[in-house]
């Protein structure tokens, strides 16, 4: 197995193992993390069936996080900074579309393309918007004002659908 990316999600052992965090930390450890050293806490959890509850536990912060990204992009000092933030925001937005998943969806999307494909199956009218963010996640090139307008519009739509 090749390790292609290392991220750090900071949390205490008690927080990770708390029953209230089973759908967030438990899911994340079981399905997305590989222990490189120390106690492998993922062994404490059974595999999780795909569900909207887990999507909300993991991405329920999408409105505040994406609003913060929009603000940071508008305040960016350099084009490099803005493009980096646009890429990050696009990736978060695409993954956050899981909060709209159907309980009948039987798979966890792994790639950004799979996230978009699943999303568009349920919301075909949003294909163009989803494809815009997929292109920005891969190779950001939109002007900051254009990007934040798209981001804020998609965010409002998503928030109205989550109810």
Where are the regions a protein language model picked out?
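Conserved nucleotidyltransferase catalytic core and NTase-mimicking acidic/glycine-rich helix/loop elements
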Residues: 41, 46-163
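Conserved catalytic core of two-metal-ion nucleotidyltransferases
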Residues: 1-37, 64-66, 72
């Amino acid at each position: 197995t090749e390790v292609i990316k290392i991220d750090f999600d900071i949390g205490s052992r008690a927080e990770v193992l708390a029953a209230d965090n089973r759908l967030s930390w438990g899911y994340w450890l079981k399905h997305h993390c590989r222990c490189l050293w120390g106690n492998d806490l993922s062994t404490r959890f059974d595999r999780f069936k795909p569900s909207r509850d887990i999507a909300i536990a993991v991405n329920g912060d999408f409105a505040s996080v994406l609003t913060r990204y929009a603000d940071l992009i508008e305040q960016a000092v350099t084009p490099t900074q803005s493009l980096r933030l646009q890429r990050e925001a696009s990736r978060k937005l695409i993954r956050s579309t899981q909060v709209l998943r159907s309980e009948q969806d039987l798979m966890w999307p792994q790639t950004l393309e799979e996230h978009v494909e699943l999303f568009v199956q349920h919301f075909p009218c949003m294909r163009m918007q989803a494809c815009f963010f997929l292109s920005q996640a891969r190779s950001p090139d939109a002007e900051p004002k254009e990007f934040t307008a798209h981001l804020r519009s998609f965010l409002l739509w998503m928030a109205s659908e989550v109810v």
